[in-house]
Amino acid sequence: MKPIKEIADQLGLKDDVLYPYGHYIAKIDHRFLKSLENREDGKLILVTAVTPTPAGEGKTTTSIGLSMSLNRIGKKSIVTLREPSLGPTLGLKGGATGGGRSRVLPSDEINLHFTGDMHAVASAHNLLAAVLDSHIKHGNELKIDITRVFWKRTMDMNDRALRSIVIGLGGSANGFPREDSFIITAASEVMAVLALSENMKDLKERLGKIIVALNTDRKIVRVSDLRIQGAMAVLLKDAINPNLVQTTEGTPALIHCGPFANIAHGTNSIIATKMAMKLSEYTVTEAGFGADLGAEKFIDFVSRVGGFYPNAAVLVATVRALKYHGGADLKNIHEENLEALKEGFKNLRVHLENLRKFNLPVVVALNRFITDTEKEIAYVVKECEKLGVRVAVSEVFEKGSEGGVELAKAVTEAVKDVKPVYLYEMNDPVEKKIEILAKEIYRAGRVEFSDTAKNALKFIKKHGFDELPVIVAKTPKSISHDPSLRGAPEGYTFVVSDLFVSAGAGFVVALSGDINLMPGLPERPNALNMDVDDSGNIVGVS
């Protein structure tokens, strides 16, 4: 690794905007972005994927490798990524720093506590929870209805036992007993707010708008009513600054914020993306999970808020994932199976069609695994060419930037100035926005709203939230809301079970299927493989 000062020097960053965290990590003052406003923006490349298998398809690895490969062919590039969540790192998913020869460094530190941003978000979130209950205890001036408190508590850990709890037990000195729950930090609205804020003023305004409860008159109670947004912003004072690290080949990487893509908008901070676009010719950013989740939200929501739009999209696919969506069993996924591959290719086709609806030039990055056969690779390449889409076999895991030159060249040939196309208009009613997404992206035949969802729609209309964008919270395991439906399901009924308003973040969340905001650990979590020796060397994390 290079000292972080050398990476900063590549970007022209002076000491007065750089806050080092040891030798290899630094934060960049978010106010530095203001000084770059007259610079021309570089190209923005959005990396997304087909519907992933449980192991993931290498989207982060591809993003890192592509950025390094662009630099290799003479194009100044920065990669922007989300911060890993500690819960999944210790649980099933593992770390989120790439793999092989295409990683961001120092991987262990990034995957664990990094610069403390997750802690800051959790602290701000839990401060609000504590103040809310304290207000109820000390007279309840706002007349908060304790049966209609929406704000939960949070921690950055997978712990299913905290999904439903009772607080305030032990007598009146401990407050009023009521049901509560914990959510994982990446699911906190504070995380979404931080990722969307462009400066401290914006951050405080968004925090103040967060809805925490209803009062006994059925009126909304916000953070601003509790007058706690200033203290929350104090706890986030450093977390608003993007984190600068490097890839395995010394390419600059900005890693900042970590909202999940299945329950939030699923991409790194707007500050980091805009800063990278000012400092490079090509910014490579990724959106979580498949294109039905992260990419749609990036375009319909994040791009609108940030005032930018991708110049091209990279659709990461693997032979493994396509065979899985064609019916192959995970136990035999590495065996050649052209029939399953043919059937599963329909999943790639749907994601490609969806991306083209946004007027985006697309490059398919076929992330090669050592078990892929030549026949399987040739089939995917041939089918992509039939669809008129550029395709490049990527070997950045094994070879680093050398293995992504073909992909980098394809991307530079594909990029263009794109006229933004959004699937819905902001003044469309929320139910219409959901129907458009369900039919156009998820390929449903019809949409059904539960009674709970219908009541939520009435609340949304009554309080003037009908013109907010929609974030659909659903499974990442299927294009549909049903994780058992692999491949390219269509014509089914898309069921909306509930809706809620994230007024600070500025969107309405539509819940479909079984969505948990607090994950649980598997039978054998990754934590069982982790250790540290007497010299402080960590094993089993990255």
UniProtKB/Swiss-Prot annotation:
Q: Which organism is it from?
A: Thermotoga sp. (strain RQ2)
What domain of life does the UniProt record list for this protein's source?
A: Bacteria
One of this protein's Pfam families, by short name?
FTHFS
Q: This chain belongs to which protein, by name?
A: Formate--tetrahydrofolate ligase
Q: Where does ATP bind?
A: 53-60
Instruction: Give me the reactions it catalyses.
Output: (6S)-5,6,7,8-tetrahydrofolate + formate + ATP = (6R)-10-formyltetrahydrofolate + ADP + phosphate
Q: Which family does it belong to?
A: Belongs to the formate--tetrahydrofolate ligase family.
Point out the gene that encodes the protein: fhs
The record's listing under HAMAP family reads: FTHFS
Record InterPro entries? Formate_THF_ligase, Formate_THF_ligase_CS, P-loop_NTPase
